[in-house]
Amino acid sequence: MNVLAINGSPRMDEGNTAIILNPFLDGIREAGANVELFYTRKLKIGPCNGDMSCWFKNPGKCGQNDDMQMILPKLKEADVIVWASPVYYAGITGPLKNLMDRQLPLIMLGDAKSKKHKVVLVSSCGAWELSMFDPLLAQMNALYSMPDTNSEFVGALLRPMTEGMKEMIKAGETGLVDEVVQAARDAGRQLVKEGRISEDIQKKVSKPLMPRDAYYKAAQEMMDQAKKSME
C-alpha cells in the first residue's frame, strides 16, 4: 500500500496538526505500508487558472509548470491520500486548497479507468468544540460522495484543543495526551489492515481533555501572558 500525505500547515512539523498526523503515519508504516509526506510550505503550487486546458486542449496535463507536475503522478498512483490541515477561517489552509483544486487533470469526465483511492482527513484546531470541523467534513463528504468519484472517504482524525495539548505536555500532564497520540497511531495501523478507520478510534482521537469552561479560562490566561510579553 502506498500512502501519500500532504500537510498543509505553514508550521509543518512544529504545527498542531503534526501532533496527530505524525503518529498516524507512524502507525501506517508499522503496519507495512509505504508513506510519502509533503508539506505545502515547501512546494511551489499556484492556484488553478480555470482555463480547462487539462480537459480539452491537453487532456490529463496541467499547463502550469510548477511543483504540481511532480505531485500529480503521486496522487494518481497513491492507494491512500491523507489531507492534513489546521482549521483556518472554517476551512483548510489556502495552499492546500490550491493543491486540491489542481487535481482537475486527474478527474477527466468519463474516465472510468482511474485508480481508486481511499481518503483520510487529519485536522486540528485550537477551539474546544468539535463542531469547528463541520465545514471541513462537509467538503470531504461532498467531494467523495459524488457518483462518478474514484475515491472513498474512510475516516477523519479531528483534534480540537491542540494548544491545550501542548501546554499539558509542557506541564508534564501527559496521560490523556498519550492516549490521544496512541489512538492516532492505532488509526494508522487499522487503516492499513482494514481499509478504514473505525468510529471508536476517531472518537478517541477527538475526546475532550478538560471541561469547556476550564479550557477557555486557561486559554485566556495564556493569551494575556502572551500580550504582556510583547509589551
Located regions from the model:
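A short small-residue
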Residues: N2-A5, L121, M161-A171
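Glycine-rich beta-alpha junction loops
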Residues: K44, G126, R159-E163
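Short, surface-exposed loop/turn motifs that are enriched in glycine and acidic residues
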Residues: P86-Y89, G126-L130, T174
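Short, glycine-/small-residue-rich phosphate/pyrophosphate-handling segment
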Residues: P95, L109-A156
